[in-house]
Amino acid sequence: MSQSKDLQGGKAFGLLKAQQEERLDGINKHFLDDPKYSSDEDLQSKLEAFKTKYMEFDLNGNGDIDIMSLKRMLEKLGVPKTHLELKKLIREVSSGSEETFSYSDFLRMMLGKRSAILRMILMYEEKNKEHQKPTGPPAKKAISELP
């Protein structure tokens, strides 16, 4: 088996993610230098947050999020969509292919006017993190607190 096809975990996966992060940082720099987005407040931190989310769902590191990665992301957020809805969403976002969208497409959507869908996705994910189950024994309740 060739080394380039061996994507097992560990060192090879770490190198793949490091290369992916370098590519995405280059795209972020392009967006930071673009005068169209210079008026956005706190653009640097937004781009870092978007990069982290994109890397989380681009598991194979090829630079594109496909329909199954998008499906997994929405299911994780508790907003499952049908295959046709996912295709429509990708078609709206993508500048080229109908089956995938790139990091540049993702950023244009997030920073542009048509960002409501993905902002909603990120908002649900943040709310999901806030409601973590408490650890330890449950708190004692008085009789008046019982239903």
Swiss-Prot record:
Residue positions binding Ca(2+) 2: E98, T100, D105
Protein name: Allograft inflammatory factor 1
Gene3D superfamilies: EF-hand (1.10.238.10)
EF-hand domain location: 45-80, 81-115
Gene Ontology cellular component annotations, sorted alphabetically: actin filament; cell projection; cytoplasm; cytosol; glial cell projection; lamellipodium; nucleus; perikaryon
Residues engaged in binding Ca(2+) 1: D58, N60, N62, D64
Keyword tags: Acetylation, Actin-binding, Calcium, Cell membrane, Cell projection, Cytoplasm, Cytoskeleton, Membrane, Metal-binding, Phosphoprotein, Repeat
Modified-residue entries (N6-acetyllysine), positions: K11
One Pfam match: AIF-1
Tissue expr: Cardiac allograft, spleen and testis. Expressed by inflammatory cells (macrophages and neutrophils).
Subunit structure of this chain's protein: Homodimer (Potential). Monomer. Interacts with LCP1.
One of the GO biological process terms: positive regulation of G1/S transition of mitotic cell cycle
Molecular function as annotated in GO: actin filament binding; calcium ion binding
UniProt organism field: Rattus norvegicus
Function: Actin-binding protein that enhances membrane ruffling and RAC activation. Enhances the actin-bundling activity of LCP1. Binds calcium. Plays a role in RAC signaling and in phagocytosis. May play an role in macrophage activation and function. Promotes the proliferation of vascular smooth muscle cells and of T-lymphocytes. Enhances lymphocyte migration. Plays a role in vascular inflammation.
Modified residues (N-acetylserine): S2
Mode of membrane association: Peripheral membrane protein
Modified residues (Phosphoserine): S39
Gene coding for it: Aif1
